[in-house]
Amino acid sequence: LSEKRWVLLIASEVGRTDSVSDRAMERLVDAIGEEGYEVVRTTSPEDGLSLVTSDPSYSTILLDWDLEGESQFEERAALDIIRGVRHRNKKVPIFLIADRTLVSELPLEVIKQVHEYIHLFGDTPEFIASRLDTAVERYHEQLLPPYFRELLKYNDQSAYSWDAPGHMGGVAFLKHPVGQEFHRFFGENLLRSDLGISSAPLGSWLDHIGPPGDSERNAARIFGADWTFYVLGGSSTSNQIVGHGVIAQDDIVLADANCHKSICHSLTVTGARPVYFKPTRNGYGMIGLVPLKRFSPKNVQKLIAKSPFSKDARSQEPTYAVVTNSTYDGLCYNVDQVVEQLAKSVPRVHFDEAWYAYAKFHPIYKHRYAMGVPDDMPDRPAIFSVQSTHKMLAAFSMGSMVHIKLSDRAPLDFDQFNEAFMMHGTTSPFYPLIASLDVAAAMMDEPAGPTLMDETIGDAISFRQAMASIAHRLRVESANGEAWFFGIYQPERVTDPATGESILFEDAEDELLMTTPTCWTLHPGEDWHGYQDEDIDGDYCMLDPAKVTILCPGVNAQGIIADWGIPGAVLTEFLDSRHVEIARTGDYTVLVLFSVGTSKGK
């Protein structure tokens, strides 16, 4: 916030005439400049809409509704700009400039969305500029989330520290040429923000007091949880916190055999008696979901009876279950169905959603994420979601969250659970990392979060369709129809539920693909996914649009080996030589991820 703030002025052509309105506008621009703002002008609605959707750093918007000019634009265009702003930011002040239009004549939608109505001749330019400055100051006070706001405020006070860390706000680095390079690279703000735990205004992360607690409660609201804990060791640590917080020695627990090693560690340390659900696998080697029938009480009891670990357990009734959602290749459970089944056997269900922190923020994932399980589900267990916030959202690496949806069926004492949290914590947390979790959560709040996810999924769909289109055109244009290109793990055709029409994936409308989960559902009787019909019945399994698996020639979904192929490692090596880093390499697959940080240039 130390950089100069700027105001976006979207108005019909000014500065080229000598009209009274033109001169009044120029005087207002000068007065705003005297308040310390830069005024960025655009004269067309197209440019204005482009700016408000591409650069969110403006502090306020001045929007011309009916100002005279050579290319005055329609009221409808101004309304589109207002909608474009509010689609991303519901707090930034919008000042509507109108010479002739009375407030009573404005559409109600406009009246609800604008901050103030400016008549250029009603007050002096200096007074209007002062009103604008007041609105901007109020906006910036409310803009920042709790922890980052206090960290910024503390740093601005330039307090002397006689506490750890020893670099003392980066000063130590300035005493050595190597340290100076380090300081130059990371910058003073980051180093000054690396503070000791004795900085009282910043509260206590371990005790959830002050700004850290305020931030966690804000994140809980945003993500739909009752409690949220910020974890600074990644989801590997978060998984262990959950396990250590709820599992007792010799408890029987139900675990996805595809679970992360951190869950195995938590089971080992707690002395749990694990009984494993076996997931599926297709011909590409992709690990799929655990079929729904394997979560049934009958199958659970069968697994417990067969397991040597169940002998001498405290009870033959399991106390906890853990499931990986989504899989590493982007296959998502119908979580509501999973919980409905597991609720018949366990009072606690833990979903490892390390790569899936964004699911709440787009309707295509409805029923498919942990914190979305209905509160009124009969006998609902306590639900735990572990997310690597840094993986797919905008937190620093190692930033993670534990979200908890409480249940009377399995009461959880906050202080007792916090002991497990503190066991994996530190009295020397990295404050910028906490701030990044605070900011990552705030960015996903409405309306910006859903908009970011809409854009992310739109980019992923564009990439998918482009790849499918290239492959299709190469086959059509080749002499023998045998030309090849890399494939994408997705259906070749989708069905519009409104019309029943079957459409090539690359020809489908964006709106259809972005709003219709059945376009991404794995259906029985289709060859492209490679899973058995009985394991994916109904809408149980859905492919995540944001996780894109590129298929190399050499094997198909049924595991049939071709005469020739290109292993995934070869493609990865090629891309690496072009400075393109991908997420994961399989035998004949390469995974790329679309997140809120993906650029269209990629």
Give short role names for the model-derived ranges.
Residues 20-26, 45, 57-91, 99-105:
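Conserved phosphotransfer microenvironments
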Residues 14-23, 68-77, 284-294, 363-368, ...:
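Short, flexible/disordered intra-domain loops and linkers
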Residues 188-237:
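Conserved N-terminal alpha-helix of the aminotransferase class I/II PLP-enzyme fold
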Residues 41-43, 74, 98-103, 107-134:
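Output/docking surface of receiver
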Residues 457-602:
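Conserved C-terminal alpha-helix-loop-beta "cap" of PLP-dependent enzymes
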Residues 12-41:
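Two-component/phosphorelay signaling modules centered on CheY-like receiver
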Residues 122-208:
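Conserved PLP-binding active-site segment in aminotransferase class I/II-type PLP enzymes
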Residues 42-45, 51-54, 68, 107, ...:
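Conserved PLP-enzyme active-site core in the AAT-like
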